[in-house]
Design a protein with these regions (language model features):
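Short, well-ordered beta-strand elements
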Residues: 62-71, 94-96, 237-248, 258, ...
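Aromatic- and charge-enriched surface segment that lines or borders ligand/interaction sites
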Residues: 288-332, 489
Length: 548
C-alpha cells in the first residue's frame, strides 16, 4: 500500500484532528422531527437513525435480510439475540442461515460480487501491532476477493489513517492516529464490534506443570518450549505431550499458511529473526541483536551455529532468500508491503532495507519464517515436509487424525537460568478434534493433556476443579458483525450506526459467553492497552454507541 501512504504534512493534519469530533458524523441528538412509514415508526435514537437511512435509500420497511453464521452453538445464540433485536424494531425481517466453516468463508469472499443480502457474524484475530486489526478489514484496497474487506467499505479518511499509522514511527503519534481511526470506524460503522475474546487454555494439572497462556491463538503451543521468551513446560512422569487442534492442518509452507490452525501446528517448527514474547515484548530469536542505521535501514547480527532440521547451517543468505521467497505468494503482503531489499554484509550480518519508514517493522519480522535453501531452490517441498530451525521437527500428519512433532536435539539454545538447554517434552501429538464438546470430553477422559477455546459455559467448572489448570487472558481476537456496505439500506451510515447502537453486547457476553471476554466497541484489542484502554472504550461508547 506504499502508493497510498501520506506525507508528513498530511499525517500531522490527521493527528491534529481533535479526538471525538468528526465533521459530518451523524449525531444522536442531531435528529429532528420524526420520519414515518406505514409499517414502522422509530422509537428512540437508534431507530431514528435507521429510519433516516431507510428514507434516504428509499427502502420501505420491513427489509428482509439474513444473518449468516458458521455452524456453531454460540454463534447461533448470538444470531438469535441479534435477530430478535432487529426484528423488534419493525424495520427488519431477519432470518438466520448457518453454514459450514468453508462455505461461510467462501460466501464472505464472494458476497459483494454476488450482492449477497446478508449480515455476517464473524471474528478476527489481530496481533501485536494495531495495524493488524484494521488494515485488511477496512482499507478500500483490501476489498474481497483479494483482501478481507467483506462489505466493500470505502472511506478516504479511514484509508488515510491506516496508511499514516503504518508509516509513523513515533509511538505517541501512532497512538493518536489509531485512536482517531477507531473513532472514525465506529462513527461510520461498517461493522459492529461486539466482544473482545479471551485466550482460554485448560490442562490436566496432574500431568502438565508451569503452563503459560500465550494471548494469540497461533502461538498457543509456544508454552511447550520457547527459550527466546523464557518459557517452557514440563510433564509429570511423561515425555509425550498430547494437545489438540480445532480443525485439520491445511498448509505447512509459511508462504502458503493463511489459517490459525496451520500456524499453531508449525509454530515450534519454524523460527524468525525475532519473536514477540508473552508480554508483547520483542525478543531476539535467530538474530542476536540489531540496530537502525537510518530511517529505513536495519542491520542484524545473526546467531551462529544455528542448524536447520535438514542439516543446513544458518547464514545471511538464508535470511535474504527467505524474504524474497514471499514475492508472488498468498502471503506476499506480509513482506512486500514494506520490504525493499537485503544486503549481505557477511555470513552472519545482514541489512534489511524498507521501502519507507515502517512503524510495525519489528513485529512484522515475527511473521517471516526463515527456511532452508533446499526449499527455496525447489529441492525440498515444505508443503510435504516442513523444515525450519525450531526446537521441534515434523514427524507426521495423519489428515483428520493428528499432527506429530519430535524434539530437535540439535536446536541452537544452550540453556540459561530460566530455561533448560533441552526441551523436557520429547514428542508433541496434536489430536485433530473439530467439535468443542468432543475436545472437552477427550480432556476429561484423560486422552488430552491440554485443550484451548473450550465452550465458555464449561470454563467455570474447570476453574473449580483442582485437577485442572486454567489460563485466561485477553487475546488479540474480537467478534464482529459485518454489514454489506455495497447494498442498500446498509450502504447508508445512519442505518449501520443505528444497528450498532442496538447490539445487545452485555446480554451476548453474559448469556452466550458466560462473561468470558470483554464488551467491545472498537476493533483494537485491549491487549494493546495504549491504543484501546478502558477509558478510551467508554468515551467511544458514550459518544457513538450508547443511545442515551
Amino acid at each position: 500500500m506504499a502508493e497510498n501512504s501520506v506525507g508528513a504534512n498530511e499525517r500531522n493534519r490527521l493527528r491534529r484532528r481533535s479526538f471525538l469530533t468528526r465533521a459530518g458524523a451523524v449525531g444522536v441528538a442531531g435528529l429532528a422531527g420524526c420520519l414515518s412509514f406505514d409499517s414502522a415508526t422509530a422509537d428512540g435514537p437508534a431507530e431514528e437513525l435507521i429510519e433516516e437511512g431507510f428514507a434516504t435509500a428509499d427502502i420501505e420497511p420491513p427489509f428482509e435480510t439474513t444473518i449468516a453464521i458458521t455452524q456453531d452453538q454460540e454463534r447461533n445464540r448470538v444470531a438469535q439475540l441479534l435477530q430478535s433485536t432487529l426484528n423488534g424494531t419493525d424495520f427488519f425481517d431477519v432470518e438466520i442461515e448457518s453454514r459450514d466453516f468453508g462455505s461461510h468463508i467462501e460466501s464472505m469472499l464472494s458476497a459483494a460480487d454476488t450482492e449477497e443480502n446478508a449480515i455476517f457474524v464473524s471474528s478476527w484475530t489481530g496481533g501485536w501491532d494495531p495495524s493488524n486489526y484494521v488494515a485488511m478489514l477496512f482499507h478500500s484496497e483490501n476489498q474481497t476477493p483479494n483482501g478481507l474487506n467483506v462489505g466493500h467499505y470505502e472511506n478516504e479518511t479511514v484509508d488515510e489513517y491506516i496508511d499514516a499509522g503504518l508509516t509513523e514511527t513515533d509511538s505517541d503519534d501512532r497512538v493518536e492516529i489509531y485512536r482517531n481511526l477507531q473513532q472514525e470506524l465506529v462513527a461510520d460503522s461498517p461493522a459492529s464490534f461486539v466482544r473482545f475474546r479471551e485466550a482460554t487454555h485448560v490442562w490436566d494439572g496432574d500431568v502438565v506443570s508451569d503452563w503459560q497462556t500465550y494471548p494469540l491463538q497461533p502461538g498457543s503451543y509456544y508454552a511447550v518450549y520457547a527459550p527466546w521468551a523464557g518459557v517452557y513446560t514440563d510433564l509429570e512422569d511423561e515425555t509425550e505431550f498430547v494437545g489438540d487442534l480445532g480443525s485439520d492442518v491445511s498448509n505447512y509452507d509459511p508462504v502458503k499458511i493463511n489459517g490459525t490452525v496451520s500456524s499453531q501446528a508449525t509454530a515450534l517448527v519454524y523460527e524468525q529473526l525475532v519473536g514477540v514474547d508473552f508480554d508483547g515484548e520483542v525478543q531476539p530469536m535467530l538474530a542476536t541483536d540489531w540496530e537502525q542505521r537510518d530511517a529505513t535501514t536495519y542491520r542484524f547480527s545473526l546467531r551462529e551455529g544455528v542448524q536447520f532440521h535438514n542439516g543446513e547451517k544458518l547464514t545471511a543468505t538464508h535470511v535474504k532468500r527467505s524474504f524474497q521467497r514471499y514475492e508472488g505468494t498468498t502471503r506476499e503482503s506480509d513482506v512486500y508491503d514494506w520490504y525493499e531489499s537485503s544486503t549481505i554484509i557477511d555470513d552472519h550480518t545482514i541489512e534489511i532495507n524498507c521501502k519507507r519508514e515502517y512503524g510495525p517493522f519489528e513485529t512484522a519480522l515475527f511473521n517471516v519464517a526463515i527456511v532452508p535453501l533446499a526449499a527455496i531452490d525447489g529441492e525440498l517441498d515444505l508443503q510435504e515436509e516442513p523444515i525450519g530451525t525450531g526446537p521441534y521437527r515434523f514427524v507426521e500428519h495423519e489428515s483428520g487424525n493428528h499432527w506429530r512433532l519430535r524434539r530437535f536435539d540439535d536446536h541452537w539454545f544452550t540453556g540459561d537460568e530460566a530455561v533448560p538447554a533441552t526441551a523436557p517434552i520429547e514428542t508433541i501429538t496434536l489430536e485433530i478434534i473439530t467439535e468443542q464438546s468432543s475436545r472437552q470430553a477427550a480432556l476429561e477422559r484423560g486422552d488430552l493433556h491440554f485443550s484451548y477455546n473450550l465452550p465458555s459455559a464449561s470454563l467455570a467448572d474447570f476453574e473449580r476443579d483442582d485437577a485442572y489448570g486454567v489460563g485466561r487472558r485477553v487475546s488479540g481476537g474480537f467478534d464482529m458483525i459485518l454489514y454489506p456496505c455495497y447494498l442498500p439500506p446498509f450502504s447508508e451510515p445512519s442505518v449501520r450506526r443505528g444497528c450498532n447502537m442496538l447490539i445487545p453486547r452485555e446480554r451476548i457476553l453474559e448469556n452466550v459467553y458466560h462473561e468470558i471476554g470483554q464488551v467491545a466497541y472498537t476493533p483494537i484489542s485491549p491487549l494493546l492497552e495504549d491504543y484501546a484502554g478502558e477509558s478510551f472504550q467508554q468515551e467511544i461508547a458514550d459518544e457513538y454507541v450508547r443511545p442515551n
